[in-house]
Amino acid sequence: MANVADTKLYDILGVPPGASENELKKAYRKLAKEYHPDKNPNAGDKFKEISFAYEVLSNPEKRELYDRYGEQGLREGSGGGGGMDDIFSHIFGGGLFSFMGNQSRSRNGRRRGEDMMHPLKVSLEDLYNGKTTKLQLSKNVLCSACSGQGGKSGAVQKCSACRGRGVRIMIRQLAPGMVQQMQSVCSDCNGEGEVINEKDRCKKCEGKKVIKEVKILEVHVDKGMKHGQRITFTGEADQAPGVEPGDIVLLLQEKEHEVFQRDGNDLHMTYKIGLVEALCGFQFTFKHLDGRQIVVKYPPGKVIEPGCVRVVRGEGMPQYRNPFEKGDLYIKFDVQFPENNWINPDKLSELEDLLPSRPEVPNIIGDTEEVELQEFDSTRGSGGGQRREAYNDSSDEESSSHHGPGVQCAHQ
């Protein structure tokens, strides 16, 4: 006798654990014929057990899991399927999967309703200073007139079609001796597992057990919260009979700011200055997210290069739950150069005397050819498509040494 962890499925088919594939098939066909619902209408549960046992044991991978680890192997190794939980509970006395699909269960064992997700748009000022706002939502609550029963006391009856489960197991024959089990929502009770005569239904909720109610939530956006962060209101989602309400979850969505960009607890901004400011120092002010007017000074004689970044410590975003600690503010300077011919040519020599000396130009030896620098418009391309084709015919090693013409000089 084979050494296996559990023999219940083998016992259902009446075969030993070491049974061959042919022995399993023979036993299954015999039992399926005897307990088929068409022949034996009262043996539906028995037929499901037989089909489930054969489905597991006829699959080499599932059989190996079951032989080695028993019930636990099937729990952890199977991906689940419609109706399997109901069948598994008949055999092992416990559910393999949640019978109602994707609904989870709470710690007290009750089914738990779905969470309600709502986006909440907030400004960068809101996230910097914190904000309290009110949000109006519509949700289902248990009908107070019938206490969520749907009708007067005693009028609610278990659905006979699905036996109160809300779903029905359908058996479809694929081939002689081979059947498929399918699970579908019960059409008689619309998946509720209960039916109420129309004359006995609650007038307020019309037998639906729940009514719509407007809920006002007070939302606290704390200082330092971030885009994508969640604010959860536990148990405030839709109510339903016998179901623990899920949560209302607000997903923060930060709106774009015209001045600042956020990076974690740091802030970034770009400021334009002229050439004279870049060379001779400057002073400017800006309004911070809390309304303060911040003055930035840079001394004469210290040069600001185009595109350089300077930092102001402690003027970034407050840390979440530690708002007295703040990140930094990074300022990128966009140096604006004068337009062409902005100065009288006669004055250029005076300007050059004030600026650092030019580098020495090396002596030109041999034949030379003078070329002209022109404006480059990246939207029109380089115009050198035909010339580039010649390079494409060269070897990979040669072509890798040629740089494309799309690199634009920075104006300085």
UniProtKB/Swiss-Prot annotation:
It is a lipid-anchor. CXXCXGXG motif repeats lie at residues 143-150, 159-166, 186-193, 202-209. The keyword Nuclease does not apply. Zn(2+) 1 binds at residues 143, 146, 202, 205. GO terms for biological process: protein refolding; response to heat. It is found in: Membrane. The keyword Iron does not apply. PROSITE patterns: DNAJ_1, DNAJ_2, ZF_CR. This is DnaJ homolog subfamily A member 2. It comes from Bos taurus (Bovine).
